[in-house]
Amino acid sequence: MKNLSPLHAESRVSWLAHTASACLIDEARLSPKPGLVDSRGNGAHQDLNLALMERSARSLQPTFHALAEQSWRRPADIALRETVGRLGREGEAQMMLATGGVNTHRGAIWALGLLVSAVAMLGGEGQSQAIADAAAALARLPDGFAPKSFSKGLRASRRWQVPGAREEAQCGFPHITRLALPQLQHSRARGASEPQAQLDALMAIMTSLSDTCVLSRAGMAGLQAMQQGACEVLAAGGCASFAGRAALARLDAIMLALNASPGGAADLLAATLFLDRVAG
């Protein structure tokens, strides 16, 4: 998208922000997701529900707008990295206000925030791999103003010595570009409905993601159960098939029994939906 007028650039910025927020809502509503909040209920959560997730997603639209606006046609450098970090932390504070202190989308702010910024850096358009590469370049830069605190995800990543959300972004979101997007397109091509194709994309992520949300609650055995169950869904034909849906129901029961929710995979699914909609 070359030499957009200021009016058209602002229109694109607004569209990116709306799309990012809409993808969070679409991910939350998608059903049936194993262990996750969806249109059926709260999954393995006591403090989350669909209305709260939707309120959180809408509260983040101004943050996504600011990220796109501040990143428009800028190179990946320390100044932009620190701006993106500051806006992300401000967005997290707004999320907490909207939810009464419940962490609904901290991981999604990181993943989607980087991808929104990356699209804007490229002038509002780009192929999915180019967008992911731009996000990775930004994620690899240090943010000198980031607080020296440890999230649950970071603690789990270090305890179990597995890559977390930071490494996923710094590597260019391989679970999106190599697994989720190809699976989404493959399932659509085979005649799956859009919700079924999106569930298959979630399964593709879950087959190999070291989801620190699951690790925090259920340890390595729980993570392996999640990965194996997701593999079985896809091996059975995916969610468009009766056998695949039966395997998905079994995986849902396993996650609920473990009291574990693959929140990291859900964040990456929302980011997958965003890339699918904005990439040229």
From Swiss-Prot:
InterPro entries: CitG, TriPribosyl-deP-CoA_syn
Record GO terms (molecular function): ATP binding; triphosphoribosyl-dephospho-CoA synthase activity
Pfam families reported for this sequence: CitG
Documented EC number(s): 2.4.2.52
UniProt keywords, alphabetically: ATP-binding, Nucleotide-binding, Transferase
Zinc is among the record's keywords: no
Coiled-coil spans in chain: none
Claim: Chloroplast is one of the keywords in the record: no
Catalysed conversion reaction: 3'-dephospho-CoA + ATP = 2'-(5''-triphospho-alpha-D-ribosyl)-3'-dephospho-CoA + adenine
GO biological process: prosthetic group biosynthetic process
Superkingdom: Bacteria
Alphabetical list of HAMAP family matching this protein: MdcB (MF_01883)
Purpose: Involved in the formation of 2-(5''-phosphoribosyl)-3'-dephosphocoenzyme-A, the prosthetic group of the acyl-carrier protein of the malonate decarboxylase.
UniProt record similarity statement: Belongs to the CitG/MdcB family.
Listed name of the protein: 2-(5''-triphosphoribosyl)-3'-dephosphocoenzyme-A synthase
